[in-house]
Amino acid sequence: MQKKDNQTIRFCKKCLYSSQHPLGIVIDINGICSGCKIHEEKDTINWSKKWLELKKITKNYKLKKQNFYDCIIPVTGANDSFFTVHVVKNLLKMNPLLVCYNKYWNTPLGIKNLSTLRIKFNCDIIFQNVNPIKVKKITKATLYKLGSIYWHSLSGHSVFPVQISIKYKIPLIIWGAHQGLEQVGMYSHHDNVEMTRRYRKDHDLMGIEAENLISSSDNLTESDVFQYFYPDDYELNKVGTRGIYLGNFIRWDVKKQHEEMIKHYDYKTCKTNRTIDCYDYVDSFNYMNLHDRIKLYKHGFSKITDQLCREIRFNRIDRNSALKTAKLYEKKKSLYEKNFCEWLNIDQKSLNYLLDSFKNKDFWKQIDVTKWKFEGLSHLNKKVEIIKKNSKLKYIQNSKIKLDAKYITYGKGIKDF
């Protein structure tokens, strides 16, 4: 527990999250957070019954389909895409249409995984390639306004499937896990929460939809951002668009699921500099690097903390070891920033200066003009020493990304920046 500006910041006694979590978290009188409490449902729910609920939902869409596709699955070259397609195609026996938003910071590994996904599961896929000039304008605007380089990616990935649902009249969209449920216990598994525009705006997009960007930037016009507009309620109701999450019906365990996909479908993984997890976000040069550095600045924790909280809850690592591991990784160098600066046409010093302005004063203390002291949980506890070796958690690394690798921007041809 620490005090900042007359407010108390509390930390969960079981995991590493604080009461300042951007998704909102509740820590009870016993010091246990809502994320840890909801996670306990995974061991008490009758998952066989939940699976039957899912089969009943999807059966209705198979019987009522108006075209060749039973549903839509948003995919990338990483994360839960392989497992989600596996469940839908092989276990639920549905014929999905895959949709993918081009993030433009694609790694060779992500391109390989995306190709493998299409081939192994024999699925049709549609890509959305927004003009890279527009993507750069949007990224520069959100970087200056929100301290976010990932707004365009989060917006595109979450709206493109909905647009395709309207265009092709495919009502059902199937997602993997719900982030708010998994991380902070925003909902119970029993709520069967579904995709909403409100959650997308408030959390994925940091309260700023595409329309808001136009009014808050002198450099953006409607023609720059129209591809990120969410369909209106009339269109959604006409088609009956809804998005469900498999994590409500399956005992969601990302590490276990990834290892199944590695074994059966040759999912490619690699080590990144700022975490022990080799499985998440291997498709992006920036997510586990610059984006993760920004996350540490703004929220006082990075992706390694998300992953360690998850592993604590699955009893694969104890809290003290997790805290030591977080301290080892969370401030490691962010790689490939030169690529980003060249892509966006800004210099590194200007980027660093801008990002300093977004540092959360609850977790960062300014010593002088260029020097800051981090005061997150791992650095507040003086008893926590940096461990020389990684935790006992084991991950399968079957590939590598070279340090001099460049973005693969398949939208308008492949070009080295």
Task: List where the protein language model places each region.
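Nucleotide-activated chemistry modules centered on ATP-dependent adenylation/adenylyltransferase
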Residues: 1-71, 87-373, 380-417
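Hydrophobic positions on the alpha1 helix immediately C-terminal to the Walker A/P-loop
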Residues: 83-84
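Short, glycine-rich nucleotide/cofactor-binding loops
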Residues: 71-80
